[in-house]
Swiss-Prot record:
Function description: Responsible for synthesis of pseudouridine from uracil-55 in the psi GC loop of transfer RNAs.
UniProt-listed Enzyme Commission number(s): 5.4.99.25
GO biological process: mRNA pseudouridine synthesis; tRNA modification; tRNA pseudouridine synthesis
Record's protein name: tRNA pseudouridine synthase B
Length: 296
């Protein structure tokens, strides 16, 4: 079994829980995910099955979320799963004030990930250290937010904002909610999150765990996405039989006029077949193709 699965992760399960369930369902040892989704979030969780796990780093990095942000509340995890540090009446907050501040979060920005995150510090994940009562100084990182679209606003003692976020990989929506509240002086936390797009996969085309169980039980076709479709954003280089032999031996190939950068390698023999991923660099006499992932 070989390919990608667009899984709809349900609420309250960890990404690892989903991977474990799919391993058992498909009877496959090699299943991995393309980006952690918090237990209190649902939506697209790209999975790779079989040797396709080696291709996970090459999925598109862009992501889209629908976030529910609650103002007037601060927690130690920056979402409702954590301990409440502050809860107050901020009924004075207006949508106009939010609209004025949102553009400052667009583009490449500096962001400090939440204390409760999967980032490793000295070999330990931050959430493990936080649960053990050993908070760390979390280093900031540069992330990219491409678009912020207001979908809804509810006034009240603790107003709520529905916000669509289009961003690059590594962006924490919990941190965005926290920082938005800090910038407005009200405090804020993430009260709900749905990942609508990730790894080039969309929520509309995802399959839930219950549906997948039924598919397996009824011995229907598993909706695996072929690598050449999942990695269609990459330029494709086709190899003939002679070049294929050299490819499978891990040899670098000097070829003319290839697109520089990461490319998808396929066979020109028979049906389209993914052979792996390579890096193309310019040389004096053409371009050189260096294997990065070779799939047998």
């Amino acid at each position: 079994m070989f390919g990608f699965l667009n899984l709809h992760k349900p609420l309250h399960l960890t990404s690892h829980d989903c991977v474990a369930k799919v391993r058992r369902l498909l009877r496959q040892k090699r299943v991995g995910h393309g980006g952690t989704l918090d237990p209190l979030a649902e939506g697209v969780l790209p999975l790779a099955v079989g040797s396709a796990t080696r291709l996970l780093p090459y999925l598109p990095g862009a992501k889209q979320y629908q976030a529910l942000i609650r103002f007037g509340v601060r927690t130690d995890s920056d979402d409702l799963a954590g301990e409440v540090l502050e809860s107050k009446n901020v009924s004075y907050l207006t949508l106009a004030a939010v609209e004025q501040i949102l553009p400052t979060f667009l583009g490449e920005i500096e962001q400090i990930p939440p204390q409760y995150s999967a980032i490793q510090v000295n070999g330990k994940r931050l959430y493990e250290l936080a649960r053990a009562g050993i908070p760390q100084a979390v280093p900031s990182r540069m992330v990219t937010i491409n678009d912020l679209k207001i979908l809804g606003w509810r006034s009240g003692n603790q107003p709520e904002l529905d916000l669509q976020v289009t961003c690059g990989e590594g962006t924490y929506i919990r941190a965005l909610a926290r920082d938005l509240g800090d910038r407005l002086g009200t405090g804020a936390t993430l009260a709900g999150l749905v990942r609508q797009q990730s790894g080039g996969m969309a929520l509309d085309n995802s399959v839930g765990l219950t549906a997948l169980e039924k598919i397996v039980a009824e011995e229907e076709h598993i909706p695996l996405i072929p690598p050449q479709e999942a990695l269609s954003h990459l330029p494709t280089v086709q190899l003939n039989s002679e070049l294929e032999k050299r490819w499978f031996h891990g040899q670098r190939l000097l070829l003319p006029d290839l697109p520089v950068g990461v490319v998808l390698i396929t066979s020109e023999l028979g049906p389209v077949k993914c052979l792996g991923v390579a890096l193309v660099t310019p040389e004096d006499h053409g371009t050189v193709l260096r294997p990065k992932v070779v799939l047998n």
